[in-house]
Structures are given as C-alpha cells and as structure tokens.
Curated annotation (Swiss-Prot):
Protein name per Swiss-Prot or TrEMBL: UstYa family oxidase VicYc
Oxidoreductase in keyword set: yes
Organism: Bipolaris victoriae (strain FI3) (Victoria blight of oats agent)
Domain comment, as recorded: The 2 HXXHC motifs are conserved in ustYa family proteins and might form active sites.
Family: Belongs to the ustYa family.
Record-level Gene Ontology MF annotations: oxidoreductase activity
C-alpha cells in the first residue's frame, strides 16, 4: 500500500494551480474526462475551504478604476508560509511499502 501525506495547504495550492491552467488551454492543453473530474473536485474543495473558513472580513467596493471593480485593500494576518513549508518537508511521511 502506498502511503502519502501532505498538509492541506499544499492540496489547496495544487487545486488553484490546476484551475489556473484550465484558463489557458492554448498553453497547457485541453483536459480530458479525468481532468474534468479533477477540476470538479478542485472547485468543490475550494468551495468547502471558503465555507469552513468563513472569512467575515468586510470587502468595501469603492468604484471602478480602469473599467475594473476596485475594492480597498484588506488587512490580513498570515502564517509564515516559508516556515510551514520547511516544517512539512522535515515531517513528511515516506512511502512505507
């Protein structure tokens, strides 16, 4: 049995990157049926993250700049992603097969 584990944040980033590539089929190619299933999984996964996290920070839209809807910058307190990545690399589970 193959054992593989990773932190959820890396799964989330993988899904965002996969969906980003779908926007550029001329660059990354079109997806097949398995890719569509994967895309649906990623969309649902990101939806669940948004619902579970339920960031209730108000977003204030102040108008348009250059034809695009503009919102005031929000203030975030973030975790140190570099430290998380380093910690995850040290603690990763190896294949125990």
């Amino acid at each position: 049995m193959l054992t593989k584990s990773r932190l959820q944040v890396f799964h989330e980033l993988h899904c965002l990157n996969f969906l980003r590539k779908l926007i550029y089929p001329d660059v990354y190619g079109k997806i097949d049926y398995k890719g569509q299933i994967h895309a649906n999984h990623c969309i649902d996964h990101i939806r669940r993250i948004a619902e579970c996290g339920s960031n209730a920070t108000p977003v204030v839209y102040t108008g348009y700049k250059n034809g695009n809807l503009y919102s005031e910058p929000e203030t975030y307190t973030c975790r140190n992603f570099t430290l998380i990545r380093q910690w995850a690399e040290m603690k990763k589970i190896q294949n125990t097969q």
